[in-house]
UniProtKB/Swiss-Prot annotation:
InterPro entries: Ribosomal_eS30. The keyword Cytoplasm applies. It holds the Pfam family Ribosomal_S30. It comes from Plasmodium falciparum (isolate 3D7). This is Small ribosomal subunit protein eS30. The gene is RPS30. It is found in: Cytoplasm. Keywords: Cytoplasm, Ribonucleoprotein, Ribosomal protein. Residues 25-40 have a biased composition (Basic residues). Residues 1-58 are annotated as: Disordered.
Length: 58
């Protein structure tokens, strides 16, 4: 067995000192087919993936 650097009494000291920050709620990311569709629209369409209205000049 290898030698231990320092006392095991201090194990986890920094993690225990760090304040707990709760996770933020985020919108779920698209997966699968929907993600590929979003990528296609982002790369190849001129309006950022949004549908054009009947009166748009885009």
């Amino acid at each position: 067995m290898g030698k231990v650097h320092g006392s095991l009494a201090r194990a986890g000291k920094v993690k225990n000192q760090t304040p707990k920050v709760p996770k933020l709620d985020k919108k779920k990311r698209l997966t699968g087919r929907a993600k590929k569709r979003q990528l296609y629209n982002r790369r190849f369409s001129d309006n950022g993936g949004r549908k054009k209205g009947p009166n748009s000049k885009a």
